[in-house]
Amino acid sequence: MKKLFLVDAYALIFKYYYAFMGRPMRNRAGMNTSVVFGFTKFLRDIQKREHPDLLGVAFDPKGGSFRREIFPEYKANRAETPEDILLSVPYVKRIVEAMCIPVLEVPGYEADDVIGTLAHKGVEAGYDVFMVTPDKDYGQLVCDNCKIYKQKGNDGIEIVGREAIREKYGIENPQLVRDILALWGDASDNIPGVPGIGEKTACKLVQEWGTVENILQNADRIKSRQGEKIAEWGDKLLLAKRLTTICLDVPIDFREEDLTVCAPRIDELKALFAELDFRMFLNDLTNLAPAEPLPEGPRSSSVGLTGSVSGRSYLIWFTGCLAETTTASIPPPSTGSLFSASASARVTAVSRLHTTLRPSSISPRRAVFSACVRDLS
């Protein structure tokens, strides 16, 4: 079955920032490069390990989302974004774009919503979908062909499917994760839960009664003070569910040509990795030896891309593997917007890339990374 990988950029960016906080990596200019290194390595490892047929990296847009409009206190409790993250994000984007991996960004919607919509459509199109994120709210999207893909330890991976959701929450229907979160609340997003109800109680209530709506209808049948508190919370509980629900109707089309990855722009990557002092990645690029010239991917555009879409499928092996290039059968180029007129997503995509990367020798920089990344699980 073909595989679609969708990466929640900011979820990983914050995770790597805090994982490396005690001993950050820095380049010769003194810049904290931990986030960029961790993100790049994990993205590279996904390509090496999984060979995704389709791949996209979703970013939260500037200006917030519709959730702030319906609940002004949404995420209002968060401290200012650390300066090291603010400095790292542009580099992460530049590297993703130079790798010619599609960048997904829709005004008014968070990355969760973009990923949720594309994951839903991807499953309908017959793909095995993997959502690359450590965030628990993605559990509501899990189904037979849609799973959470998480880093575990240094090089380990945890796949969260139906069984894992069942074991964690005691529910058969993963969609009910949003109801558990609504009852419990989400402190990181400043979504208040019902007073006195924690995770365990929320799970028990949902196991017995199902959705938040049904729980409210039967609040008078719930023993002790819990039923009274739930009834009093009323509209706040319904609002919390709306806030914790990941959208599946973001105005973005699912088209394979919009989520394919073309040949990386090697010169750009070399310049970026040299500036960041990423010797391990520079060595990989130096040893890249395609059998024939590869087409360069398109430059990104903040207003979207239009024009013809065509391409070839390349299998690129790094040192230690056979270098070969294969031509795939591709339908005639299509002309027009990469997205429908209603979609405001930015996407960089032309042709598919399956990348296998050779294991690099252990360097002091990698040793620091290995020591820090153990905290990620």
Annotate each predicted stretch with a short phrase.
Residues 6, 32-36, 47-50, 88-99, ...:
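Basic, polar low-complexity surface loops/patches
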Residues 1-56, 60, 66-71:
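Non-catalytic, usually N-terminal nucleic-acid engagement modules in DNA/RNA processing proteins
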